[in-house]
């Protein structure tokens, strides 16, 4: 049989190609609509950008919370170090005084320094408490991101359920097909997970897709 010769593309051949592509596209769309796949694909296409935006939101909230916590820790460290340094210095000076009591003038200076240190402690602790509160408040992102992630999981599970239903409703007849252990799953997913043949786990979904050749 003679093979048709390939001619250079001209305006007529280009128009013919475009027309054929249009016909194929229309046939594909009609077939998808007849099978009920157009709705599932449209929902999946809409869910993908939405899921991406939600994941970006989770990432941003997590990064902001981590940055707030780190900033609060860094701001608190100098105050903690100053209190630690002052307490150690005064403790050493008081130990030395008890070992060898010094003159009254030097004792007054030690007492004055101690009183000054004690007066500054509330300011340091107040600042540190404020930073700790900010760290705690930064963790409120978990509630928001948890809701977002749960919503995403609901959308994904719904898309999976609809696509699975489309497959189950359009399975071609195969009388010679070997009997499988999960044959009853071809009747479609059931809601009551206590019954036999219920698609109740991801493993069962995978087995069902394998049995369909996907």
UniProtKB/Swiss-Prot annotation:
Enzyme class, spelled out: hydrolase
GO cellular component: bacterial-type flagellum; cytoplasm
Compartments in which it is found: Cytoplasm
Biased composition (Polar residues): 184-193
SUPFAM superfamilies according to UniProt: Chemotaxis phosphatase CheZ (SSF75708)
Keyword Cytoplasm recorded: yes
UniProt entry keywords in alphabetical sequence: Chemotaxis, Cytoplasm, Flagellar rotation, Hydrolase, Protein phosphatase
Major localization class: cytoplasm
Region annotation (Disordered) ranges: 176-199
One MF annotation (Gene Ontology) recorded for this entry: phosphoprotein phosphatase activity
Biological processes per GO annotation: archaeal or bacterial-type flagellum-dependent cell motility; chemotaxis; regulation of chemotaxis
EC number assigned by the record: 3.1.3.-
Annotated site, Enhances dephosphorylation of CheY-P, chain positions: 147
Any Pfam family: CheZ
Self-association state and partner proteins as the record states: Homodimer.
Family, per entry: Belongs to the CheZ family.
Job of this protein: Plays an important role in bacterial chemotaxis signal transduction pathway by accelerating the dephosphorylation of phosphorylated CheY (CheY-P).
Name of the protein this chain belongs to: Protein phosphatase CheZ
Gene: cheZ
